[in-house]
């Protein structure tokens, strides 16, 4: 997925949201890993809202890999969102 930014910033679609939508639309379930990339100076992990959505889709052991042009860092979603929940 990719970020889609609008003038009304609350309508912006995060790359993770777009990736989740494509994943589900393709009939997939239970992802093992998701990678995010930025051209910035620091590898950046998903925001809290996206982490919660990823937690609900992939569970507490989902691996998140954050990369920039120089490095990659890997964490489980439980490390990034220790209080993730399912209803």
Q: What spans do the regions from the language model cover?
A:
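Compact, glycine-rich, soluble single-domain proteins
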Residues: 2-17
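Short linear motifs in exposed loops
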Residues: 1-2, 76
């Amino acid at each position: 997925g990719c970020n889609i930014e609008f003038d009304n910033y609350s309508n912006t679609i995060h790359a993770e949201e777009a990736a989740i939508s494509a994943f589900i639309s393709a009939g997939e379930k239970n992802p093992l890993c998701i990678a995010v990339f930025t051209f910035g100076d620091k590898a950046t992990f998903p925001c809290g809202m996206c982490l919660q959505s990823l937690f609900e889709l992939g569970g507490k052991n989902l691996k998140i890999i954050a990369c920039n042009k120089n490095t990659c860092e890997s964490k489980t979603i439980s490390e990034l969102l220790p209080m993730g929940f399912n209803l």
